[in-house]
Every structure is written in C-alpha cells, then in structure tokens.
Amino acid sequence: QVLTEQAVYDAVLTMIDSANAQSNDHLDIAMFYLSERKIIAALKQAQQRGVKVRMILDPNKDAFGRQKNGIPNRQVASELNALGLPIRWCDTHGEQCHSKLLLKYNAQQAELILGSSNLTARNLKNYNLETNMRVIGKAQAQVFADAGQYFDSTWGNTQGRQMTVAYAQYADESKAKYWLYRFMEWSGLSTF
C-alpha cells in the first residue's frame, strides 16, 4: 500500500496503538527525526502495555554539513528513556542516519512502514509531500526478514561495523532544550 502525508500519520498511529503484549508484539523503529506528540504518546502507551519497543535514532548532531544541537531527538529520547524504552543512537561522523523504518511483528504477522516520512508534524500533517510504503503479511515473508535483519544488525553492531552507540553517549537532559523543542514543535518554527 502506498501512503502519503496524513495517511502515513494515521497508519503509524494505528500500527503503534494496535501493538499488544498478549500477541508478543515487537516494535522496532529507526528514525531520522521524531517529534510528533501523538506518536510519542502512543509509543509511551505501547511501552506501558508491555510491547517490546526498540528505537534507533539519529543524534541530530549533524545536518547537511552543519552542526546541530540535538533537537528534537535527544529531548524526545530523554522522555522515552525515562520510561525504560530501549534507545540506541546512530554512530554518525558528519553524516546523518536518515532511515525511516517502523517494523511491528510477532511470530505470525508483521507490518512494515518505510519511506520518506520523518515522524514530525511537518512530515505527517500535509505540510510536505511524503511517500511511504506499507506492507502487511506473514512474519516469515522475505521483506520482513530483511527489515528485521537490517534493524538487528544496526542495533547490535554486527557484520564488523559500529553502527550504533548506547543511549548515554548522546543523552541530553537539558530542560531548556526540552522546552525549546516543545515550542518549536508546537509553533512550527523549526526545520524538522
């Protein structure tokens, strides 16, 4: 299924909201920008329901050759980490970790959403033209095996490459930056 803008938003929220511990659902997310508040709330609720959530985020320290201050991902990660949600940072060295992947799976079924959309209001609420693909099927299908292998190898730094670092490497508990992020997300005065 091809999804654009608001349809991506709706599908992502449905994916997260439908994940449950009784089905032994796992939710793996790799994302360049994460800032949209309803998605953050849904992730918190999924974690509290016992869904096994893992996230790989860009540390937002570099963008297009310029240094950044970590907003929004470090502030969002601080919120989610406080609930015990496992987070790793892409180990970037001037480049960006530009993946945008959400994979929900259990032993029987899987769902994959990937494409151009960051999880931000700008990307999901009809401000940018975005296109994602959504695939639903049996968990054993090759597309889900490939997506899972990509996430697991990035998470675990396998294949002889250091791809991610622990949350503590870029943790930022600054209240000033947190409230700056919240203002930027609310007002739209941001590049994310």
Task: Show which residues each predicted segment covers.
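Well-ordered alpha-helical segments embedded in enzymatic catalytic cores
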Residues: 11-15, 38
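Active-site cores of enzymes that catalyze phosphoryl transfer or operate on phosphate-rich substrates
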Residues: 1-12
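PLD/PLD-like phosphodiesterase catalytic module centered on the HKD motif
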Residues: 20-26, 33-192
